[in-house]
C-alpha cells in the first residue's frame, strides 16, 4: 500500500481541515476511467500504478481512482496536490513552509500515536506493531519530489513516493532538494516525530526517512509527444481540432510557492475554497512537439523517386505508379498543411535534380534518395541541415570564387514560385547552399513556423497564462486555411 495514501486516509479523520485537504479519490468510491498501461506515480496519491491522462494538462500523471476529482498540479485551487507543487526557484523559506504544512496535516505526538494504536488494536491479532498496520505513522517528512520542465518553467511536486526504482514512463524525474534546506533541521524534525513511535516502528521510520532524504537526484527528462493523451495524438492530423481541458480554479494568491501556507490559517483557507469553480478551455495543438510528430510521420511515407520523375501531378496526387504513389489512407494526409509541404518540397527538389543531374525516370536508383530521410523534420535542425547539405552535394555543384553553385532552370509550381519571390526576392537560375536552405525553410515555415512555437502544447500553461490568452484571444489557432506567413 502507498504510504502517502494511507496517511491521508487515517489523518483526514482528526479534524475538519484534514477532512477537506486530505480527501483523495483513491480513498473514496471508485469511478471508472480510461484504462492505460502507462506506469508511474500518481501525483495525487503518490502510489505507483497504471496511470491515466489528466483532464487539466492531458499528460499521464493520475491514477484511475484519483482521476474522478480532476486535479492537476497546474490548477489554481488550493487542493493538496497544488499546495505540494512548487515552481522554478525554490528557497529555504519555501521548504520550511512545506515542512510546516506536513507537520500541520500529519501531526505526530503521543496523543495521536496512542489514538491510532488503540484503534488498530481493537481488531483481532493486531497487538503486535507490524508495519502494514501502522503504515500511516511511518511517513517521514522529506524533500523528495517529482520534477518536470515545461517551456522554461520547472515544477516540483513534493510527496512521499514509495519504491523509487519502479518503472517510470512519465516525464517526471525524482529530484532531491535537501541541499537547499538545513539537513540537520530536517533530521531534527523527523527524529522528534519518530520519538513518539514504539521502538519496533522507529527503525522502519528511520530507514524510510534516510532512503527518501539522502538519494541522488535523477537527470531531468525531456517531455515528448508520447507523454500526452492518445486521444490528442490521434486527432493531431485534423487542422481544426482543439484540445478540451478543465482546470480547478479559485481566488488563490499569485505567490505560487506560498500556497502551502494556507493550512496555517483555517478560516482563510475555507474562504478561498468558497470561490472554487471549474474553468473550461479549448486550446490549440500548435507546438513544436506535435508538429515534429506530424512531419516525422510524413517523412517515413516519403517517396523520393518523385524527384526524378516526369509526373505532371503533385507528389501526393500521383496514382498507379509503383515508385511514386503515396498511400493516401494514412491519416497524416488529412492535414492539408502537411500535404502542401510534402508537395512543394518534392516539387522544388525535383527542379533541382532535373536541372543538374542527367536522370529521366522515377524507376532509376539514385544516391540522392538516401539523403531525404529527414528533409521534412526541420525541428531537428542539425539533422535537417545535414540532409540539405548532402542533397546539395549530390547535385554536383560548381565552385566559383570559393562558393558552390547549382543550376535552377526547371519548372516549378506556382506555390514554389511565390515562396522563391518571398524568400530571396526573385526566381533565380543559380542557387548556393544557403539559398537552398532558405527556400526549403520557407516552404515549411509557411505552414509550421517552428521559430515562434512553444515546445509543449498550451495544455501545460498555468491558469493565469490561459486566462490572459483567452482575453486576447490566442488559445485557438488561426483559421485552418491561413498559413503562418499570412
Swiss-Prot record:
Keywords: Host cytoplasm, Host cytoskeleton, Host-virus interaction, Inhibition of host innate immune response by virus, Inhibition of host IRF3 by virus, Inhibition of host IRF7 by virus, Inhibition of host NF-kappa-B by virus, Inhibition of host RLR pathway by virus, Interferon antiviral system evasion, Metal-binding, Phosphoprotein, RNA-binding, Viral immunoevasion
UniProt keyword Transport present: no
Motif pLxIS motif location, chain numbering: 480-483
InterPro entries linked to this entry: Rotavirus_NSP1
The keyword Metal-binding is assigned to this record: yes
Region (Interaction with host IRF3) location: 317-486
Annotated spans, Important for cytoskeleton localization: 82-176
Region (Zinc-binding domain): 42-79
Domain of life: Viruses
Region (RNA-binding): 1-81
Subcellular locations according to the entry: Host cytoplasm, Host cytoskeleton
One Pfam family this sequence matches: Rota_NS53
GO MF term (any one): metal ion binding
Motif IKBKB-like degron (ILD) motif positions after renumbering to this chain: 479-483
Example of a GO biological process term: symbiont-mediated suppression of host NF-kappaB cascade
GO cellular component, as recorded: host cell cytoplasm; host cytoskeleton
Mod. after translation: The C-terminal region is phosphorylated by host CKII/CSNK2A1. Phosphorylation of the DSGXS motif is essential for host NF-kappa-B inhibition.
Subunit composition and interactions: Interacts (via C-terminus) with host IRF3; this interaction leads to IRF3 degradation. Interacts with host IRF7; this interaction leads to IRF7 degradation. Interacts with host CUL1 and CUL3. Interacts with host BTRC.
Function description: Plays a role in the inhibition of host innate immunity by inducing the degradation of key host factors required to activate interferon production such as IRF3, IRF5 or IRF7. Associates with components of cullin RING ligases (CRLs) including CUL1 or CUL3, which are essential multisubunit ubiquitination complexes, to modulate their activities. Recognizes the host NF-kappa-B regulator BTRC through the presence of a DSGXS motif in the C-terminal substrate recognition domain.
Domain notes: The integrity of the zinc-binding domain in NSP1 is important for degradation of host IRF3. The pLxIS motif targets host IRF3 for degradation; however phosphorylation of NSP1 pLxIS motif is not required for its activity.
Family per similarity comment: Belongs to the rotavirus NSP1 family.
Name listed for the protein in its UniProt record: Non-structural protein 1
Amino acid at each position: 500500500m502507498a504510504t502517502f495514501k494511507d496517511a491521508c486516509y487515517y489523518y483526514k479523520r482528526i479534524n475538519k481541515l484534514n477532512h477537506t485537504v486530505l480527501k483523495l479519490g483513491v480513498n473514496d468510491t471508485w469511478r471508472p476511467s480510461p484504462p492505460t498501461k502507462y506506469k508511474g506515480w500518481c501525483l495525487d496519491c503518490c502510489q505507483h500504478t497504471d496511470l491515466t491522462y489528466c483532464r487539466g494538462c492531458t499528460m499521464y500523471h493520475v491514477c484511475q481512482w484519483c482521476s474522478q476529482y480532476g486535479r492537476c498540479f497546474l490548477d489554481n485551487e488550493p487542493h493538496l496536490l497544488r499546495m505540494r507543487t512548487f515552481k522554478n526557484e525554490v528557497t529555504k523559506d519555501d521548504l520550511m513552509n512545506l515542512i510546516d504544512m506536513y507537520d500541520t496535516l500529519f501531526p505526530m505526538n503521543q496523543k495521536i500515536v496512542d489514538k491510532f494504536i488503540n484503534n488498530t488494536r481493537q481488531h483481532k491479532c493486531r497487538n503486535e506493531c507490524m508495519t502494514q498496520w501502522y503504515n500511516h505513522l511511518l511517513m517521514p517528512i522529506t524533500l523528495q519530489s517529482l520534477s518536470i520542465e515545461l517551456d522554461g518553467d520547472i515544477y516540483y511536486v513534493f510527496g512521499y513516493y514509495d519504491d523509487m526504482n519502479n518503472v517510470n514512463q512519465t516525464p517526471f524525474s525524482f529530484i532531491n532538494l535537501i541541499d537547499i534546506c538545513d539537513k540537520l533541521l530536517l533530521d531534527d524534525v523527523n527524529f522528534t516525530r519518530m520519538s513518539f513511535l514504539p521502538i519496533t516502528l522507529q527503525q522502519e521510520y528511520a530507514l524510510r526517512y534516510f532512503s527518501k532524504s539522502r538519494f541522488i537526484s535523477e537527470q531531468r527528462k525531456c517531455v515528448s509527444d508520447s507523454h500526452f493523451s492518445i486521444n490528442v495524438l490521434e486527432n493531431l492530423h485534423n487542422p481544426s481540432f482543439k484540445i478540451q481541458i478543465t482546470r480547478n480554479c479559485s481566488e488563490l494568491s499569485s505567490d505560487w510557492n506560498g500556497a502551502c501556507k494556507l493550512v496555517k490559517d483555517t478560516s482563510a483557507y475555507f474562504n478561498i475554497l468558497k470561490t472554487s469553480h471549474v474553468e473550461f478551455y479549448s486550446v490549440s495543438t500548435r507546438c513544436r512537439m506535435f508538429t515534429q510528430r506530424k512531419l516525422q510521420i510524413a517523412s517515413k511515407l516519403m517517396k523520393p523517386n518523385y524527384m526524378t520523375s516526369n509526373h505532371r501531378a503533385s507528389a501526393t496526387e500521383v496514382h498507379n505508379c509503383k515508385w511514386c504513389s503515396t498511400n493516401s489512407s494514412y491519416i497524416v494526409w488529412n492535414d492539408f498543411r502537411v500535404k502542401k509541404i510534402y508537395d512543394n518540397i518534392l516539387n522544388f527538389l525535383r527542379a533541382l535534380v532535373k536541372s543538374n543531374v542527367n536522370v529521366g525516370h522515377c524507376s532509376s536508383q539514385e544516391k540522392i534518395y538516401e539523403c531525404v530521410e529527414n528533409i521534412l523534420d526541420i525541428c531537428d535542425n542539425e539533422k535537417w541541415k545535414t540532409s540539405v547539405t548532402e542533397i546539395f552535394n549530390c547535385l554536383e555543384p560548381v565552385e566559383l570564387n570559393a562558393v558552390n553553385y547549382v543550376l535552377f532552370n526547371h519548372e516549378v509550381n506556382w506555390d514554389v514560385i511565390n515562396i522563391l519571390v518571398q524568400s530571396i526576392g526573385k526566381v533565380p537560375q543559380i542557387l548556393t547552399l544557403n539559398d537552398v536552405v532558405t527556400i526549403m525553410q520557407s516552404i515549411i515555415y509557411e505552414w509550421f513556423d517552428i521559430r515562434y512555437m512553444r515546445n509543449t502544447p498550451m495544455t501545460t500553461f498555468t491558469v493565469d497564462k490561459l486566462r490572459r490568452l483567452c482575453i486576447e484571444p490566442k488559445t485557438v489557432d488561426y483559421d485552418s486555411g491561413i498559413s503562418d506567413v499570412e
